[in-house]
Each structure stands twice: as C-alpha cells, then as structure tokens.
C-alpha cells in the first residue's frame, strides 16, 4: 500500500530527445523519478529540503526587480540570456554602498533627532525585563514538564505567566522579535529571584488537545483552517531559522477568535548552519522524530514529523501511543516497528500527507512550504463531504483510534486503564508544583514586606529629624530676634568724627615720630651707625653693638621692651648685605648677634681703642668682638688642655725648650677674624673629611672679604708657648694702650716677630690635670685672660698681631677629639710630614691675622653648669656611650637667649647625629 501510494504521487519525467521533438512536460516541485542517461534504470530523488530564508527573499526581490514574466508572452532565450541585467547590477551596487559606507553615519543620526540602534536596543531591553511585582491577579491554570502556568494582569492586559525552574530558561531573547499571527507573542521575562517566569500572550480557549477532547463538534472549515495555520506558523519559524523541537498539541493554543497560536519554545533551537546538527534528547517521545530518538544528525525536518503526529491527533482526537510506556515508544519508533495506524475511511489526500510527514528518513519528508501547497490541493476533497457526513466520519475516526490494540508487552498496566496509584502520583505531582509556586510567591511577598518596613522606618526617622530641625530653627529665629531687639535698644549711636588735619607737613602720609627709639632703623642708617641720632650725608657704617650708637661711646641704654627688635635671619645675604662685615658671616658670634660692649650685656665699655679705623665720611667704624665660651662667668670657666704629642723635628726647631704650649678656648689661634689667604693644598689622605675639627683640610670661610671680593680659607690653629710674664688677673680693654695698638697695626714690628717665633707644637697630654701641672705656676689654672685685639677688615695687608696683655695663648680646641681620630692621624702620611702636630689643624696659616674678642657673661643656668662639668671631665673615651651621647645632644640642642649669648666659629655648621657607638666627635660633623 505504501509503495503504491508513493508511485502514484510521483511524476515520471523523461529527458526530451532531439529526434522526438515536442513540448517538454512540466516538472513537479515534489519528489521525482527520472531515467538514467542510458535509459536502463530509474533514479529516485527525494523531496528537496526546505528553502532557506535568504534564498526565498532573494527570489522575491529578483522577481520584483525583473517583474514576473507572462507565460503567454515568453520567448525563446537568446545567447545573451545568461548575461546579468545592468539594472540589477547597479541596484546591487547601490545597496552595498548604502549598507557599507553610509552605515558609518548612523551614530551621527542621534544628534539630529534620529534614534540610533543602541538606543533602540536599550529601550527594548528595558521593556523586555518585566518586574514580577507589575503582574497582578495571578491565577493558576495548569502545570507541565517545564513549570506552572498562571493568568495575570499586566497594564490592563490579560497575560499568561509561565513559571520556569531555572534562570537559563528565561533566555529567549532570540524569540522576542518573532511577530506572526500564528505564533504566540512574548511580552517579556522576569529574571529576578525567586520567581523566574516568561510573560506571553494569553489564549483564553486553552490547548488544542483540550479543545479537541472537550468539543464534540468542529466544523470542517475550522479544521482546515487550523491545519493551514499550524503549517503557516511553522513555516515562519523555519524561515527565521528557529526549530521548535517540541511541537505537539499541548503546545498549540487556541485564542478567543479560534486562531492557532504555537507556543512553548523552551526547547527551541536556533539553526546556525544549513548542515544537519546533533540535537539533544528533548521533547515528548510520542511526538519525537526517530533521528532525534537515535541521536542522529537532524535538521528542521524533525518538526515535520511532529506536525504529522499532530495531524493524526486532530483527525482521531486521541493521544498518540496511548497506554504505551515511554521506553517502548522510544524503542518502537526508533526501530520502525511501532507506527500510527490510519483510518480506512479518512480522506486519501490527508492520509497521504500524514504518512509523508511520518517518514523514517528526514529527506523523504516534505517542507512546510510544500505542505501548504499540498493542503490547498487536498482541501477540496475534504469539502466534498457535507457537514453531517463530516461529523459522522470524524466520530468514526475517534472510535477507530480507541480500538487500536498494541502488544501487551509494551503497554502500561498490561493494556488496562491507568491504575489508581498512577493517577494518585500524577495528582500529587501537580499539587506539589502548586504548593511550590505558592511558597515562592509567599517568600517574594515577605521580602517585599521587609523592604516596605525598612522604608517606613527610614521615613519615620526622616520625619523625626525634620521636626527636630524645625524646632531648632524656630528657637534660633526667636533668639536672633531677641538679640536684635536688645542690640537696638542698648547700643549707643556712633557719630563719625571728621578726620584730623595735620598742618605743617608736606606729606600727609608720614607719621609723627616722638623719638629715635620708636623707629625701626634700617641697616646702615645714621640712627644705627653714627655717634648721634642725626642723619649725615656720609656713607653709613655697619651696625654692631660696639658701634657708637649702641656702645659706651654712643647710647648707653637698650631699646625698651615695647619696641620690636629688628629681625636677623640666618641667611647671610639678608643679614650682612650692604655692610663691611662680609668676612664675618651670619654665624653666631657675629657683631649683629654677640657683641659684648653694650652696657647691660656683661661686657666692659669699649674705649677709644675699639674704634681705630675712620671711614671715608669721617665717622669712626667700630668692629665687633667675639664672645668666647671661656669668658669670665661663662658656663665653661676652666680650660681643657688638649692631648699633646711628641714634637717632631719640624716643630722642635721653632719650639722653646722647657716651655709647654697649650691651647685655651679664648686663644686667638682658635678664632682668627682677620682677612687671610691660604695657599695650602687640600690633603688627599683619608682624614680629608668634613668632621669637626678637621686637622688637614684647609676649610674655607663662608664669609667673603668685602675688599677683595674673594673667599678666604680659614686659618689653622697655632700653638703659642706660655711665658712667665703672663698675668694672673683678667685684663680689661683699658689695659690696651696706644703703643700696643700701634704695634698691632705694624706687622713688621720686632715685638710681633718675636711672638711669632715662639710658635711651637703642643705636647701631648693625656688628661686635664696633667695639662694643668705642665702649665706655668704664675698662670691662673682656672682662667686664662682673653686678649683683645682690633683690626680694620678693609686693611688688606697681612699683619701679625701681638699679644697686647703679654699673656701666653693656649687652646683646648682639640681636647674633645677621640683616640680613634688620633690613631687615624698617626697612620696618615701627611701628619708625619707635619711632625705629628695634633694642633696642626685647619687654623694654621702663615698669613694669619688675629682678632680676639673679650666677653663676660652675667647669667649661668644650672643646666649649663651640669653640661660644663660633663664636658670638662670627659675625655671622649667614656665607657658609658649613652651618657656621652646625651651630653653631646644636650649641648647641641640647648638654646641660647639674648642675655646668654654664645660665640661660634664663623662658619656654617650642619650637625647631625650618627650611631651611638661613635666615641669621637665625628658624630657631629661640620660642613663648610
């Protein structure tokens, strides 16, 4: 029967022979059988595949461009028939230009009011996501393998809500663009936990299977319409490359207008290739194609097989393969031993279409485009019957399906009806799904209730805070009003007085000055650098505390406390600009900071000898005198004898036998103030470093000479032997007679040359007591008088100064050096050349000029006294390193006040602390 039907439906087409001219027969679009080239056998061709979408669109566009030809006016094709048309060529070129080049200007369209593609997609995404809260009046309709279905209201529209179990089941964005009258419309999805659901169009009449079983009568027109609409909907899906894979009567809905709506695309597949692909095992086995059951490569023809099962179901109104176990269906359909029997009285065209769709091989199944064409051919056969005959025949088809007998080995419950246990399980499953959905809805509303309560608490707190602020604002306004009223009542009315007019002043901007003490005199002004307070036309002299306006020769009292003292900064350029004291620098001990000749500073009044030079304007220029730590009354009353070394032959030639030499802190060798020049080369030994005090490096003074405008190197220390003619008392500036001043000025005087010949090396002393024992008996062991000398810095001649008081000059400058530095000196080759003179330091110079200042302090604090004891009794080798380091840091960090000045060496000192294990004073380095 099957073979006969297949032969009758095929058209036999033979190739036209040249010897037998005649009209060529029309070829069919369906499966054909043609003769082989030799004519010996027939070749069967299967039905062509479903035309893909782009080919159909191309054919439609080509037909629109060229126009449909009239069969009556067709002519034979000429030789140029294969040549493409120029119109289509240019049209295709313009289309490519429009889609290629002009597509670059699409983002610019947004500036002119045209929506871009991104904006459109964004708005679609926002509309696609529907919050579950927006759906109201949910009503349970039923449940299936993928979830329960509810009916609800969304924006005054009845919608169907299908609740799914997983989030990935809501990913159907590839289906939202589907718009067809026979395809269910998807409105959006809910992808927020806990309710994942799909919102779609609602069909009031329900599923097709339900309608078929519930309605006793269905007209033949309605039956033919439903078949055509199902084919049209599936054809639209295949055109959009969508394979349903689960087409069955429960997934076909009936709308209120009795229109077919294909739904449930949960198992749909987006076809990306023309070739057959391996698909997963999904769908219901009763409607499943054999190739899908056997997991063979398949294509869109699997939906054609399912469509054939749906046609059989519509014809018989019975469930296919009823009461057969699923595994039996899978095995029977897969091995082609189980099939759906056809009623004998059914229309032949409908039966033929069903059998073609149920073919085992997918290539033998027609496409939906061919199905639509064939249905139009078979429909007249259906309308040959009357309505009554149709109803009787339709009922008979149902009875035929009920009487189908299957082997008892494959039926459930051995062919009997469903057992009560199976029915109870199905009811429990449905009830369980309903309860799960109710539970999810309850959880969702509980979460919403919590959010609502939280928002209410926040609003309540905001209202409370707002009321509190309102009360505070009202109280503040009330207080402000009361204060304004009180102010207006009690405040006196002020009347502005006219500005006082000063007469007799050429410039009204000048202020009246009562005395010279109320003025801030600038540096170099006549108020600071002259004997009188009147201004003069001569060049102003540099200001110092020894000048005529501040010393005993000038004003005798200091400025009152109310007057602001002039600020002296550390910057040398600001502190010493425009003065003769460029050689003195801005260090502590400069004339602007440490003069001792003011009446209340603890120093003696300066005599006429302190002003030995006369400037070009006729004014006396007074020079500063440095205040040393060894001054009378200072915090270091004694002198610390430095360690001695055995003099070498170089120094022995100049030393006086039997006369020990010492360096005291008030020695002129320590702080020479004269303008000097040193040509000694810098040593290349390891002692050539910036540690204080340096023994080999000829340090450069920071102070430049104002006359020569050059930097002078610092003078080196010179050891002077003590003589028996040294005085035991502390001299005063009045001891300086004119003769001594005269000898000071004359560098070639015999007396100065005699004193210079007494320069010898300091013998090594291991302690302070030994140094005192080696000194002269007539010498004061506690105090050595400072020697006051004077020199004009403008005098560029090299002058050897004389000890005006006939006192031997000693120094303990290097007494604080450690033995580690002494060991370094012994290993130095340069020290061997200098005779291992420990005092052959950077203060040695043959062009040395002395300027020594005397000072006496009037205040000594307890802290200074304790530091003095620690400094005098320490030789740098103390075992307690922490205590020594503490003493050093105390000395370095101690601040001196104006009443307790401190003289410093005229150089810029940058002190920093190294590790605590340093015994030497190199921890406080001196950088010049």
Swiss-Prot record:
KO phenotype (gene knockout): Overcome the lack of synaptogenesis caused by the loss of rpm-1 ubiquitin ligase activity. Defects in axonal microtubule development. Double knockout with dlk-1 also suppresses the eva-1 receptor expression defect in the madd-3 single knockout. Triple knockout with madd-3 and unc-54 results in paralysis (as in the unc-54 single knockout), and suppresses the lethality phenotype in the double madd-3 and unc-54 mutant.
EC number: 2.7.11.25
Position of sequence motif SDGLSD hexapeptide: 874-879
Gene Ontology annotations for the cellular component aspect, listed alphabetically: axon; cilium; cytoplasm; dendrite; neuronal cell body; synapse
Catalytic site positions: 246 (proton acceptor)
Biased composition (Basic and acidic residues): 53-69
Biased composition regions of type Acidic residues, renumbered to the chain: 509-519, 823-833
Biased composition (Polar residues): 42-52, 647-656
Location in or out of the cell: Synapse; Cytoplasm; Cell projection, Axon; Cell projection, Dendrite
Region (Disordered): 1-72, 483-575, 644-696, 802-845
Primary location group: other
Protein purpose: Component of a MAP kinase pathway that functions presynaptically to regulate synaptic architecture and presynaptic differentiation. Phosphorylates and activates mkk-4. Has a role in axonal regrowth following injury and synaptogenesis. Plays a role in modulating polymerization of neuronal microtubules. Also promotes tubulin post-translational modifications that protect microtubules. Plays a role in cilium length regulation, possibly by reducing rab-5 mediated endocytosis, and may also have a role in intraflagellar transport in cilia.
Protein name, as recorded: Mitogen-activated protein kinase kinase kinase dlk-1
Chain's gene name: dlk-1
